[in-house]
Amino acid sequence: MAYVRLTSLAVLFFLAASVMLNVKKTEGGEFLKCGESCVQGECYTPGCSCDWPICKKNHIIATNAKTVNQHRLLCESHEDCFKKGTGNYCAFFPDSDVHFGWCFYAESDGYLLKDFFKMSKDNLKMPMTIIN
């Protein structure tokens, strides 16, 4: 009786291991990793955006896009972000296969970092001269 239980446990373990090893691993992980569907065009998981009807990782949306007009946050230059009104900075992904960047507001994100690190507001200003 114990032999049957042990055998069924071994078979179950083998099936689980084979399924886990067959999952294709990509650089950015699964595109469904956000784990939610779009609610009124919004995704609440950080690093995810709505690609109706599901939320996808931002770099997956940028990889699959053919033009910058396919998503409101895609850009090729800072000017694209200004024109769309979705930010003032176009940041490109470190993966060279992604030809588009992602728009965001550089100053507002800087203030969020300031609050996170509890820095003073003056630390974000660019120095006018270099002091040796």
UniProtKB/Swiss-Prot annotation:
Keywords: Disulfide bond, Knottin, Plant defense, Signal. It comes from Clitoria ternatea. This is Cliotide T2. The keyword Signal applies. This is a cyclic peptide. Belongs to the cyclotide family. Moebius subfamily. Expressed in flower, stem, shoot and pod but not in root, leaf, seed and nodule (at protein level). Disulfide bonds join C34-C48, C38-C50, C43-C55. There is a cross-link at G29-N58 (Cyclopeptide (Gly-Asn)). GO terms for biological process: defense response. InterPro entries: Albumin_I_a (IPR032000), Cyclotide (IPR005535), Cyclotide_sf (IPR036146). The presence of a 'disulfide through disulfide knot' structurally defines this protein as a knottin. Probably participates in a plant defense mechanism. Not active against Gram-negative bacteria E.coli ATCC 700926, K.pneumoniae ATTC 13883 and P.aeruginosa ATCC 39018 at concentration up to 100 uM. Has cytotoxic but no hemolytic activity.
